[in-house]
């Protein structure tokens, strides 16, 4: 399952990550690159409906605005959760470090250190998701053992 992302001009897949404030993985969904970000978020959040009952705030990129807010509100267990969209300032082009966005980018950087995740070697999206989970388990175990700086 590969697609073409016309915004970034790339073939392949998108990795949708749901992380906590420490950058540790809570959920992952891998989709074709042609799938819009908010549609990927809908499929990811559908799996998480009943797992995180204490969650009250979700920070998201501008790409996740729109239907996602209405969809979250329509779900009874998720009505207590507020979706905060981290917006880019008007008129600024190029790279800009956005508040809270760097949490996910840092996790992507951690995952990029694993050779198996540096390129899209996997045929099935489920295999990609599994390899991301394995890499995060390895990272968390090393962090618990104190062999890697946090």
What are these regions (language model features)?
Residues 50-51, 77-80, 89, 107, ...:
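Positively charged, low-complexity intrinsically disordered regions
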